[in-house]
Amino acid sequence: MAKRDILSVLDMKNDLDEIINLSIELKKNRYRSYESLRNKMLGLIFEKPSTRTRTSLEVAIDQLGGHAVYLNPSEMQLGRGETISDTGHVLSRFLDAIAYRAFDHKNVVELARSTSIPVINALDDVEHPLQIVADFMTVKEKKGKFSGLKFSYIGDGNNMANSLMLGAAILGVDIYVATPHGYEPKSEFVDKAKQVAKERGSKVIITNDAIEAAKDADVIYTDVWISMGEESKRGEKEKAFTKYQINSDLVSNAKKDYIFMHCLPAHRGLEVTDDVADSINSVIFDEAENRLHSEKGVLYKLLSY
């Protein structure tokens, strides 16, 4: 079977909907015993902290009959100067796949180039593809469809914004991205998303108007304003994003049955207020749970051969 990497949401362009449907089926049969990945070994290399991604990946591979090996970069020879390429060649001899959470996307690409096994981007500075499977799985569960939905991301034009645009475009969802001026998503991702959206009959709208994005939205999504590694920008970003907080006033512009989503962790009182995060419209913990089921879907798709 040919090696397949998932470094970007675009690597699931042809089967994202299929993976989501598989994930929903795996969730429905969560108490069934699976041995489809028996004896398969997943390596986890995490340069950044993780609660949901690491835990869900470890549980996911275990529930499918395989095993996870956590590799702390500071305890590997990577931390002493061994190249990513050499590391990839060696780990390919021991493992069946690697999930890599990195500060720099270039390192994820380099690892994938040097391995003979699948590499999964478990979050880097430009994308978070695993989160997208869980997010749109949640949308499918709550809304029952993708076509005709207005999905609004309001916040920083970061890695989540990049990946959400691509995921929405692939699935035919209209997406609005509202950010302060100067914090828009990278143009290369906007261009890629618009090209896919054109093919799939949906649209990608970039705006600086949070109310425009929230108006009649079916989904309102946000993420932290200060990403990992950006702590020095806290004061600057908090000032710039004040009008982009997800609060009761802003969501009053959305449809009454809108759902609120957040990839977590949430900085309550900054990008979202408690009354929204804890409202009946909030699905953030269902969304978090779906990290497990969606990653089972991804791993099954990559490794069940």
UniProtKB/Swiss-Prot annotation:
Pfam families noted in UniProt: OTCace (PF00185), OTCace_N (PF02729)
Lineage top rank: taxon: Archaea
SUPFAM superfamilies (UniProt xref): Aspartate/ornithine carbamoyltransferase
Binding site for L-ornithine: 159, 223, 227-228
A GO molecular-function annotation: ornithine carbamoyltransferase activity
Pathway where it operates: Amino-acid degradation; L-arginine degradation via ADI pathway; carbamoyl phosphate from L-arginine: step 2/2
Gene Ontology CC: cytoplasm
Protein name, UniProt field: Ornithine carbamoyltransferase, catabolic
